[in-house]
Amino acid sequence: LGPFPHTAPRATISEQNPAGTDGFEFVEFAHPEPQVLRDLFSAMGYVHVASHKSKAIELWQQGDISYLINAEPGTHAAEFIDVHGPCAPSMGWRVVDAEHAFKHAVAKGAQPYQGSGKALDVPAIVGIGGSLIYFIDQYFDTSPYNTEFEWITDAHPTGVGFHYLDHLTHNVFKGNMDKWFKFYGDLFNFREIRFFDIQGKHTGLFSRALTSACGRIRIPINEDRGETGQIVNYLKKYNGEGIQHIAVGAHDIYDSVDAISERGVRFMPGPPEAYYKMSHDRVVGHNEPIDRMQKHGILIDGEGVVDGGETKILLQIFSKTVIGPIFFEFIQRKGDDGFGEGNFKALFESIEAEEMARGDYGDQVSAD
């Protein structure tokens, strides 16, 4: 899989990386009630560091993570709210040369965004579900926000210890997973690094995990196995395809999760006690504190301590849905570069149980 997203070397434009991708820059969010987003991001440790000079757009940061809250009327984000409700209307990518990346993508078949409702004055194309992908090349020596935003406080505050965007997952209509794999592959030379076939108690999904040539942009794509599953449920609630969850990396997941829990962030139901009792059999040689894992339901995956003493462990936990059907993942990688595939079934059934408790499946399935 290569380097972790936050430690990969700076990209160059090459045959392997023809668009010159170099990582996530931001995720944009919009909500009919923007204060809901402010309260949520504050609870997660983010700080309002800057505001747009002429638009109702706020920049919230923590570590190397940037979120935009867009409350400006008449924008692409405002139109997105009309269709989807609370939503993630765009993501920004770091690229070596924004104009080059834009022209390359359009030449390969991307739809350029020609509207006047951009969050930032940079090139953009239309992506998943009508969301946008912005191309940003001011990020290495200078902030991309200096031109259009007024700074309120110092950039990149420590917050509660989340420090980079690890991956961002899409949910798509049944039959469209390959279409979107082709989109990312043809335009940006993404490649598949994992394929999953997950079966819960009542529903299932397929997932293709993709990574960019630079190694910093990871996008799993999910589609439902059937007609009544949780991906179908998301698509109904969101009124279309889009971003299912955003995963952020922690320096110390236990301290970070304790902190956001105290601030009111709630998580998906944790696994049964047997999960933790069996964790040493599944993740050999780990010495993670079971009591702290169990406190909030933190999951563990990986090979454990492998030959030669190398550690390959991944720790992860998921918030409840907090922006419409969108949720967040909090992750700490200790030598493991996967997606917690050993936990997929536990997570899947946890989401399924939550949705069944809310009656999201109606009479289509019945509990055991």
Regions found by a protein language model. Name each.
Residues R10-T12, R225-N233:
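Active-site-adjacent structural elements in folded domains
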Residues P86-S90, A101-G200, R208, E288-I331:
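Extended catalytic-interface subdomain
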Residues G20-P32, W151-R218, E227-T228, K237-E273, ...:
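Surface-exposed interaction/gating patches
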Residues K55-E58, H76, T142, G200-H202, ...:
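Flexible loop/turn segments at secondary-structure boundaries
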Residues L1-W151, H167, K174, L314-Q316:
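An N-terminus-focused feature that recognizes amino-terminal "leader" regions
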Residues Q62, C214, T321-I323:
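A generic beta-sheet turn/junction motif
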